[in-house]
Each structure stands twice: as C-alpha cells, then as structure tokens.
Regions:
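Acidic donor-binding segment of Leloir-type glycosyltransferases
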Residues: 22-67
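Active-site acidic Asp-centered loop
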Residues: 40, 94-96
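Glycine-rich, basic loop-to-helix element that forms the pyrophosphate-binding segment
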Residues: 68-86
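Short aromatic/hydrophobic "clamp" motif used to bind/position activated sugar donors
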Residues: 91
Length: 183
C-alpha cells in the first residue's frame, strides 16, 4: 500500500507535549498515513523517555517512527532530513504540542490536494471568544501570492500571514525546487 500522507512531528525540549499531538493524530478519520516523530537533540531527555513513547504508540499507527537526533541540528536541517525520509506524497508538519482542529482535519487536507493540482496549501482559522471563526489568509492576501513583488512588500509591512503550523506540501515540490535553505 502506498502511503499518501506523512505527518512529521518535530520536537525540541518539549517531548512532554508530544502525547497530546499523537493523541490528536490518532483520532483522525483519514488512515493512510505514516507518523514520524523526531527530537532535534533535546538535552533534557534520555533514550528511556523515547522508548516509553515508542512502546506506547507503536501499535496505534500503521507506520510509526520515533527518531532521537542526539545533537541539535536546527529547525531547517531537522525538517529537511525528515522530508527526505517521508514516504507520503503529502507532507503535514506539526510541532510537539500541536493538535488537529478536529478528527476530519487530515481528510480535509487530503481532499484539498485531490480537488486542485497545487503543490502547497496554507490556511488558518482564528476561533474567537464568541465562537465565530475567521479564516486566514483573506482573499486579498491570497491574491498577493500570484504577485510576488506585492507579496513581499505586504509581508514586510504587515507581517507574514503564511503560518508554518498550517502549511502542507506535496512532496514533489521539494523534488522540483529543492529543500529549505539551510544557511
């Protein structure tokens, strides 16, 4: 069976929060994915800590791997190494402590890639106190993505509206354009 999605969970000094992330992944209705959890050399955990998590979750997922880098390589090198290991056609990065919004989140991500031929998707929602939901980026911000000079001007003035925590990639984007710049 071909794996369609790879959920990458990056950890640094917050392994204690990975349980809520893994529990959120476990609740997903979509099932054709692998989970790669990788610690980037946190100095405050032992191999025994990693072994406990592996033991707890190895049977919860069809494909599960926990990696302990041993040394800190930095976020970008760490992420690039995990992209290289990913078997899925869609990359869904999470950080330790992140949770999917609901049990259909991964299915919705996969549907978005199925419905349109895009290499990258990003979206975020702000849930306000009165339980209303505001979607980001706005339609105006989306239009800026097709106008690179206006996009860069906008993010320099108003901040970057593209959130790494809610950006998903077809793996082929990295084959076509390369990995993230490690400099």
């Amino acid at each position: 069976m071909n794996i369609e999605a790879t959920i990458i969970v990056m950890v640094y000094k917050n392994l204690n929060q990975v349980i809520q992330t893994l529990d959120s992944i476990k609740k997903q209705t979509y099932s054709n994915y692998e989970v790669i959890v990788s610690d980037d050399g946190s100095p405050n955990y032992t191999q025994e800590d990693f072994d406990k998590i592996t033991e707890q979750y190895k049977n919860e997922f069809t494909y599960f791997k926990l990696i302990n880098n041993g040394i800190n390589r930095g976020t970008v090198k760490h992420f690039n190494s995990l992209i290289r290991q990913a078997k899925g056609t869609i990359i869904c990065p999470l950080s330790s402590g992140d949770q999917f919004y609901n049990e259909n989140s991964l299915q919705e991500i996969m549907n978005a890639f199925d419905q349109e031929d895009k290499l990258i998707y990003t979206s975020k929602r702000m849930i306000k106190k009165e339980n209303s939901i505001e979607y980001y980026p706005s339609l105006y911000q989306v239009s800026l993505l097709d106008q690179s000079n206006h996009f860069f001007e906008y993010i320099m003035k108003y901040g970057n509206f593209v959130s790494g925590a809610s950006t998903y990639y077809k793996k082929e984007i990295f084959d076509k354009y390369g990995l993230f710049d490690e400099k």
